[in-house]
Structure formats: C-alpha cells, structure tokens
C-alpha cells in the first residue's frame, strides 16, 4: 500500500510539474510575443504609406500584363501575356508587425499566409495614379520614390506581396511602386527563354513608366531596384530612354540603381549600358554572389556568364582576376558604380533570393538609399585590383 501511495504521489507531482512548466512556457512565450509585436509597432519608419487603419499600407503598381478582369479576383485580374500598354493601380496591404526575415520557412507559400494580406486593389487612371503617388512623395522626408522590378517566374499576386514585404523589411519612409512585367512564362527551359524575350520587350513599358514618374510625379530622389531577370528589363529600358536627348544629357534622373543577382548578359551590360548608366543614374550598385546556383543554371542555358554571378574570394588570386573581368565596365577609383559581393552572407536556400532573405543585405541597401555618399560599415570591406579597380565584399562582421 505505501508503494502504491508513493507512486500516486510521484505521479501527481510529475503532473503538477508538467502543468506548471506548460503554464510558465505559455506565459513567457505569450509575453515575448506581445513584447515583439509592441516593439515592431513602436519602431517602424514607414509613415507615408501607412493608412489610418493600423498595420495597413498603400503601395502602387504599373504593369504591362494583358488585363483579364481588372475588377475580378486577384489571381484573375492579369494574365501572363505582355501588352504594349500600361495599366495602373494601388494595393492596400495588411502587414503583421512581427513579420521578419526569419519567418521565411517555405518559399513556395509563405507569401500566401496571414502575415501579408492584400486587402484592397484599385485600378487607377494615369492622372489619378500621378495625383496619389505625388501626394505620398511630397509627404515623404526625402521626397523620394522607390521603384521595384521583380524577376523570372513572378506572377502578379506574388509580385505585389513581395513588394510589400520588401518595403516592410527595408523600412524606409518612402512611397513604393512596383513595375510588374509578365515573367511567369513557366519553369522549363523553354519558359526561361520565353521570359527572357518578354523581359527585353518589357523595357519599352518600363521606360514609359520611368518617364511618367520623372516628368509628372517628379520625386527629388528616385531609387530603382531590380532583381534577377528584372535587371534585363532595366537594361532595355535604359536603351530606350538614352535615345531621348532630355535623358541622355546631365543631370541624371535616377539617384540610385540597384541590381541584385542580375540575370543580364555581361557583354551587353559592358558595351551599351555603361554609357547609358552614366547619363541616367548617379549611383549604380550591383550585388553579386558566387554561390548563386540559379544563375549557374542560367549560365549553362545562355552559354555565357550572367551579371549576377561572381567568383570573388580575396584569398584566391585567380578569383580576384575574374572579379576584375566582371568589373571591366568600372573605371579606376569609380565611386558611381559599385560591385558588392554578398557570398559571405548568402545563406538562402537556392542562393538566388538574398535580396529577400539576408539581413546584412538589407542593412547595406538601407544605407545606400538614404545616404548621399558610399556607406562605411563594420561588415563592408573593399578590395582593389592591380589596375586600381575597387570592389566590395559584404561579410557577417566579427
């Protein structure tokens, strides 16, 4: 009998301990979650895009997709065909304040969860877009505008969500506008080649969008960011804008152009784009990575090195020579064109999405947009080739 009683007492004690542990866990975890949410709400710079309803932000888009039903569901509004004209709109997005880089668990569906919810989409006429966008620009502390161009395989709904996520994590008090081109041409080799052709053709509509922004919205500071094959859209847009005497002469119209993991052919970038870039952009930053597996596949398909692919390693002289080849378009001591290797900090799953998943990248990007000079940070190191061409390496620090 004492043995049974002792067993019952032990069982009761263990049960009480388990309940106490569970209670403490829920208490502290709940408190931690509440503190994180309160902190996220307290420390947020995005004010100009914020709507009166807490946690809802307004962004804008221009697209050259063929409209299907612009008043229908999100998935059914635009197709994957290119139109030689533009459609405009605004999208109001609810963003949970605790959403962060560490929450990228499943890249195939994380944008569809409750952290980023598209609450309202409106089609805008050109004049209304200019009016609403200009109002945000004039209310922003920098009188700035960030334009975003996404890359290969991006559908319209995910392009909207990724733009909202980018604005949230970058957290600059600036209006944000998406240029959405039909990059969703399929995942096969044929789809990739078809998307590359569409990207080249879409340069015309991006050029028209940039001209609209520069002439009518008139931000003091215009920032243009393109990822992956979106870089090809930018290159072809610059080809078109450069033919206009107003854009070909000084001063430059774009303060900062940023290309991340750019899927752009080196020869085209070096030959034509170099002079066009000087005329149109005051600063150009190209983020590259040697472990960008997606671009290695692109290289095999295109039988040439793509712009986003790097082999930088300061401990390896042969790789330094390859870096010099990549930097052929740079002039000695050139500070307008900056090459940044993110290999040491690129921890992403397919090594191609560092522009959405790497904290050090966002820290560096924030400084490049908000500062007027080249940033100097503890994580950023610069190297120089024997020909005095400078490039940068972004590290995790010490």
Name every feature range the model reports, one short phrase each:
Residues 150, 227, 352-353:
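Histidine-centered active-site/metal-ligand motif
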Residues 154-159:
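Short substrate-entry loop that stabilizes the transition state in hydrolases
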Residues 1-19, 24:
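N-terminal Sec-pathway targeting helices
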Residues 147-151, 261:
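The conserved beta1-alpha1 loop
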Residues 143-144:
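Alpha/beta-hydrolase fold active-site loops
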Residues 206, 226, 230, 234:
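Gly/Ala-rich beta-loop-alpha elbow adjacent to hydrolase catalytic centers
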Residues 25-122, 131-140, 160, 164, ...:
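Lipolytic serine-hydrolase domain surface
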């Amino acid at each position: 009998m004492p043995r049974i009683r002792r067993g019952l007492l032990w069982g009761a004690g263990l049960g009480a301990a388990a309940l106490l542990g569970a209670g403490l866990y829920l208490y502290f975890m709940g408190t931690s979650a509440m503190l994180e949410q309160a902190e996220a709400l307290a420390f947020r710079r995005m004010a100009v895009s914020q709507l009166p309803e807490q946690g809802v932000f307004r962004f804008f888009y221009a697209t050259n997709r063929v409209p299907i039903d612009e008043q229908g569901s999100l998935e059914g509004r635009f197709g994957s065909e290119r139109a030689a004209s533009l459609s405009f709109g605004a999208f109001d997005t609810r963003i949970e304040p605790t959403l962060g880089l560490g929450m990228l668990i499943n890249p195939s569906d994380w944008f569809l969860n409750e952290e980023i919810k598209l609450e309202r989409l409106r089609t805008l006429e050109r004049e209304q877009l200019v009016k609403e966008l200009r109002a945000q620009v004039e209310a922003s502390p920098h009188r700035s505008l960030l334009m975003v161009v996404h890359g290969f395989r991006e559908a319209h709904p995910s392009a909207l969500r990724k733009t909202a996520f980018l604005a949230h994590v970058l957290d600059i008090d600036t209006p944000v506008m998406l240029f959405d081109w039909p990059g969703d041409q399929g995942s096969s080799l044929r789809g990739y080649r078809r998307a590359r052709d569409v990207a080249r053709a879409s340069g015309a509509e991006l050029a028209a969008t940039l001209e609209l922004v520069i002439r009518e919205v008139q931000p003091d500071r215009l920032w243009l960011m393109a990822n992956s094959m979106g870089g090809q859209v930018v290159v072809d847009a610059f080809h078109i804008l450069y033919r206009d005497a107003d854009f070909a002469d000084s001063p430059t119209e774009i303060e900062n152009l940023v290309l991340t993991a750019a899927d752009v052919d080196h020869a085209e970038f070096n030959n034509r784009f170099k002079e066009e870039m000087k005329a149109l952009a005051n600063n150009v930053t190209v983020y590259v990575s040697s472990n960008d597996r997606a671009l290695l596949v692109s290289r095999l398909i295109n039988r040439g090195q793509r712009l986003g692919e790097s082999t930088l390693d300061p401990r390896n002289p042969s790789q330094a020579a390859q870096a010099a080849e990549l930097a052929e378009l740079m002039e000695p001591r050139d500070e307008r064109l900056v090459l940044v290797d993110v290999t040491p900090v690129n921890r992403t799953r397919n090594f191609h999405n560092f522009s959405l998943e790497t904290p050090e990248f966002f820290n560096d990007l924030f400084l490049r947009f908000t500062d007027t000079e080249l940033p100097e940070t503890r994580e950023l190191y610069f190297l120089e080739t024997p020909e005095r061409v400078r490039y940068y390496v972004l590290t995790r620090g010490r």
